[in-house]
């Protein structure tokens, strides 16, 4: 009997089972223990293969692929700390709902806890963060193939959102020519190999329940809060709110067009808060809200009913309002709860939104971080997409810009970490094949610097804007101790990214004014390659501009 040959047949069943559940993208890191899985994936023509040498980046690459494709994405890594490097992407997927299938190769049980090389306790290592966990036994012909395939099918059928961790121990030898070992075992699955359906088909449908009293609530004074959703849903939500005559507070990830722009500015005005207090119902569609003032208002508002609609399970309401948590796809829920044409009930908020926008426009000529956030709409590629980093940059865009309705916007706003942002953006581009603008801060770029290797393989123009404000300037917005701020919070690195771009053979520009930036962008959008554009800005201007605008708008 050939152990290596049977390992590969066992792995082939696993990988083929994944294809029956919509898996098309497989992300693979190098490793020896994962050889059976890697070869099975490489030999399966149903897969698009992606490779990366860094498992942390690989997990985020898969996350980006899943965001756009809306399909589960598989990840294959070897044993040991390679598995642990998937933790950040797994956590993010659990909070934002992307489906990741993590296939982690492992040593067999007799090599665990005995000093064997590259052997750690992998089973259950991700604690409660995966939505589903499956620890497979060592491959053996004593276990029928139908058990293996039905076990995979069952786990995937139960996966509504988040990650499925499948731990796969393999004994040596891992290499060798294929022979007939296990062929009969494999053939007992019959014509399943030629079919396209799962071996075990389980029905688990996410159904939207109609709120029978909606006809009553839609006649009341309401507020719509729009969080993370798809571009198509964003346009529908904007129209729905407009028909109802309800003010729409749109997050940067809502893709609603933010009809009342600069919400995180005007929500700091007491007149706006007073008017919003008249709302009898708040309907929040989508989660992961960004703006600080929005979150503060959400925490203190007390409508008669607060509804949260999202296809991700869980409460999703840190303020713990009295109301309803409705698990449904936003588009489906809107269809079941049509709007009734009514006149807008808010008067003060549209006025404040317009005045806030005028204050922002008045500062757009200065070459700086806040002004870039405001101008970002002008720099979006036609029929493209935007990826927004975390920390200060996403807050500035949320507060100061107005993105087009229905324009795709992506970000990692679940755990909101700065790790893996470039890798995620690379996955977003690969899954869509669209022109992509990504914008991150300098520390975020440093954190995921080796992901620049992924940007050598893009299928359309890709522009990475690195806003270099020399450190974590978001801490300038927080009451951090002045004497300790620079060393322990901001951590300026005093670096530039020209050498990093050159190392990976990427185009690079460092514009010093808006005309130079626009010229660099014009050239980048004509080239199906990646371009790094570094904006070196005054360290504190972005945070200070936001604070100044907040003060101005609060007194309107």
Swiss-Prot record:
One of its GO terms (molecular function) is manganese ion binding. GO terms for biological process: menaquinone biosynthetic process. Pfam families: TPP_enzyme_C, TPP_enzyme_M_2, TPP_enzyme_N. Its EC number is 2.2.1.9. The keyword Glycosyltransferase does not apply. The keyword tRNA processing does not apply. It catalyses: isochorismate + 2-oxoglutarate + H(+) = 5-enolpyruvoyl-6-hydroxy-2-succinyl-cyclohex-3-ene-1-carboxylate + CO2. It comes from the Bacteria. Its cofactor is Mg(2+); Mn(2+); thiamine diphosphate. Pathway: Quinol/quinone metabolism; 1,4-dihydroxy-2-naphthoate biosynthesis; 1,4-dihydroxy-2-naphthoate from chorismate: step 2/7; Quinol/quinone metabolism; menaquinone biosynthesis. Keywords: Magnesium, Manganese, Menaquinone biosynthesis, Metal-binding, Thiamine pyrophosphate, Transferase. Homodimer. This is 2-succinyl-5-enolpyruvyl-6-hydroxy-3-cyclohexene-1-carboxylate synthase. It comes from Salmonella heidelberg (strain SL476). The lineage of its organism: Bacteria, Pseudomonadati, Pseudomonadota, Gammaproteobacteria, Enterobacterales.
């Amino acid at each position: 009997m050939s152990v290596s040959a049977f390992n590969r047949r066992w792995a082939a069943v696993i990988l083929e089972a994944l294809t029956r559940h919509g898996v098309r993208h497989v992300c693979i890191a190098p490793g020896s223990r994962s050889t059976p899985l890697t070869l099975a994936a490489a030999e399966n023509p149903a897969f698009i293969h992606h490779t990366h040498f860094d498992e942390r980046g690989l997990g985020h690459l898969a996350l980006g692929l899943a965001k756009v494709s809306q399909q589960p994405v598989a990840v294959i890594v070897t044993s040991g700390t390679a598995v642990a490097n998937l933790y950040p992407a797994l956590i993010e997927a659990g909070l934002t709902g992307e489906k990741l299938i993590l296939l982690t190769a492992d040593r067999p049980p007799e090599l665990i806890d005995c000093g064997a090389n590259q052997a750690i306790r992998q089973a259950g290592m991700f604690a409660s963060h995966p939505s589903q966990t499956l620890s497979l036994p060592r491959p053996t012909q004593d276990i029928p193939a139908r058990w293996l395939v039905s076990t995979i099918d069952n786990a995937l059928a139960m996966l509504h959102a988040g990650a499925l961790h499948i731990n796969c121990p393999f004994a040596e030898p891992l290499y060798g020519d294929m022979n007939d070992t296990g062929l009969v075992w494999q053939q007992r699955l019959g014509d399943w190999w030629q079919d396209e359906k799962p071996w075990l088909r389980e029905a688990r449908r996410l159904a939207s329940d109609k709120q029978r009293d909606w006809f009553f609530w839609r006649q009341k004074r309401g507020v719509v809060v729009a969080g993370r959703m798809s571009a198509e849903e964003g346009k529908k939500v904007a129209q729905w709110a407009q028909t109802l005559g309800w003010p729409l507070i749109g997050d940067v990830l809502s893709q609603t067009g933010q009809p009342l722009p600069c919400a995180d500015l005007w929500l700091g005005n007491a007149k706006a808060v007073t008017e919003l207090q008249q709302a009898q119902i708040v309907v929040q569609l989508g989660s992961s809200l960004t703006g600080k003032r929005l979150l503060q208002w959400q925490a203190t508002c007390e409508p008669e009913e607060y509804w949260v609609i999202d296809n991700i399970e869980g409460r999703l309401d840190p303020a713990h309002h009295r109301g309803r948590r409705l698990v449904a796809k936003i588009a489906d829920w809107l269809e079941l709860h049509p709007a009734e044409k009514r006149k807008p009930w808010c008067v003060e908020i549209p006025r404040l939104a317009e005045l806030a926008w005028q204050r922002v426009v008045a500062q757009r000529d200065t070459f700086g971080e806040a002004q870039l956030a405001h101008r970002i709409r002008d720099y979006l590629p036609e029929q493209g997409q935007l990826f927004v980093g975390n920390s200060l940059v996403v807050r500035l865009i949320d507060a100061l810009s107005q993105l087009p309705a229905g324009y795709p916007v992506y970000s990692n706003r679940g755990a909101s970490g700065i790790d893996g942002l470039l890798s995620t953006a690379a996955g977003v581009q690969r899954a869509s094949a669209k022109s992509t603008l990504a914008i991150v801060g300098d520390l975020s770029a440093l954190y995921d610097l080796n992901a620049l290797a992924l940007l050598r393989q893009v299928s359309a123009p890709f522009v990475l804007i690195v806003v270099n404000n020399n450190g974590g300037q978001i801490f300038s917005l927080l009451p951090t101790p002045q004497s300790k701020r620079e060393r322990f919070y901001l951590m300026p690195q005093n670096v530039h990214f020209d050498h990093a771009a050159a190392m990976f053979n990427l185009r690079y520009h460092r514009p010093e004014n808006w005309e130079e930036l626009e010229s660099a962008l014009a050239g980048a959008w004509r080239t199906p390659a990646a371009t790094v554009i570094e904006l070196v800005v005054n360290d504190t201007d972005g945070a200070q501009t936001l604070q100044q605008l907040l003060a101005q708008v609060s007194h309107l």
